[in-house]
């Protein structure tokens, strides 16, 4: 996703959505990915 997206904190460690527009505190295996910055 471009431009770079949201920084995920230790409390909200997961990106959610195609562009990682929302950080969540739970990772779902298929639709969540753990990241600091989205790529």
Swiss-Prot record:
Expressed by the venom duct. One of its GO terms (molecular function) is potassium channel regulator activity. Its main location: secreted. It is found in: Secreted. Inhibits the vertebrate voltage-gated potassium channels Kv1.1/KCNA1 and Kv1.3/KCNA3. GO terms for cellular component: extracellular region. PROSITE patterns: I_CONOTOXIN. This is Kappa-conotoxin-like Em11.10. Belongs to the conotoxin I2 superfamily. Keywords: Amidation, Cleavage on pair of basic residues, Disulfide bond, Ion channel impairing toxin, Neurotoxin, Potassium channel impairing toxin, Secreted, Toxin, Voltage-gated potassium channel impairing toxin. The modification Isoleucine amide is found at residue 31. InterPro entries: Conotoxin-I_CS (IPR013141), Conotoxin_I2 (IPR020242). Residues 35-39 form a propeptide. Pfam families: Conotoxin_I2. Disulfide bonds join 1-15, 8-20, 14-23, 19-27. The cysteine framework is XI (C-C-CC-CC-C-C).
């Amino acid at each position: 996703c471009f431009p770079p997206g949201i920084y995920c904190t230790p409390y909200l460690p997961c990106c959610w959505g195609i562009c990682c527009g929302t950080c969540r505190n739970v990772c779902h295996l298929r639709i969540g990915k753990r990241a600091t910055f989205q790529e």
